[in-house]
Amino acid sequence: MKRKTVWKIWITLALIALLSITALAGCSSESSTTNKEDGAKSTETSAGTNTLEKIKKRGKLIVGVKYDLNLFGLKNPETGKVEGFDIDIAKGLAKKILGDENKIELKEVTSKTRIPMLNNGEIDAIIGTMTITEERKKEVDFSDVYFMAGQSLLVKKDSKINSVKDLKKGMTVLTAKGSTSAQNIRKVAPEVNVLEFENYAEAFTALKAGQGDALTTDNALLWGMAKQDPNYRVLDETFSKEPYGIGSAKETKNYCKSLTNT
């Protein structure tokens, strides 16, 4: 990837990061805005308040993040620290709630494990490139969109694949388990083989080992992979919209608002 392109990505992420902390005040949950009993609303408010009080009493915010996605959440092998856009948002929330961005514990999640970890109480929130979908809203309450991505393909620089339409029967596309990417690619390219891995780091390693013709996920994540290895390129084409939101446990619909109003 050209250096100029990389800088454009970082500038864009930096600008969004400045806006995200305040933008979260509009936590989206369509079902909570209409036809609610006063008692139900009171219960949701209480649940959100109790969650916030629990975090303050504990003295740290526990957030589920990705460890394998350059630009968003990647563990630095030299320092052992996790770095990226999602990490900066998590630290911003910790500072807003507890007055110190360092009062935070980052737990590794994958697309497959993040919702179960949230719902069993291991983490307070998910900030891990999670697309807001109607299906996920049944299990998770979401903040407003903090980043809009689109699904694309990562291929070798000399690959003849320049569009999703170039994916033919017999080809193999790699992705991660539990992701919307796996669902989407099966819809737009039903004849290809889809191999799902535990995380995107494993999928990228498999691509470099020749186990597939392309890797698919959101373009923002693919840019990070291409930045790591210049032998690969991201297609300009996208074939979905992937709005990222912060996830919190169900029945704490006012939790996100509480976080930003602290």
From Swiss-Prot:
GO terms for molecular function: ligand-gated monoatomic ion channel activity. A lipid is attached at residue 27 (S-diacylglycerol cysteine). The keyword Ubl conjugation does not apply. Residues 1-26 form the signal peptide. Its main location: membrane. GO terms for biological process: amino acid transport. Gene3D superfamilies: Periplasmic binding protein-like II. It comes from the Bacteria. GO terms for cellular component: extracellular region; outer membrane-bounded periplasmic space; plasma membrane. Keywords: Amino-acid transport, Cell membrane, Lipoprotein, Membrane, Palmitate, Signal, Transport. It is a lipid-anchor. A lipid is attached at residue 27 (N-palmitoyl cysteine). InterPro entries: Bact_solute-bind_prot3 (IPR051455), Iontro_rcpt_C (IPR001320), SBP_3_CS (IPR018313), Solute-binding_3/MltF_N (IPR001638). It is found in: Cell membrane. Belongs to the bacterial solute-binding protein 3 family. Involved in glutamine-transport system. Interacts with the glutamine-transport system GlnPQ. This is Glutamine-binding protein. It comes from Geobacillus stearothermophilus (Bacillus stearothermophilus). The gene is glnH.
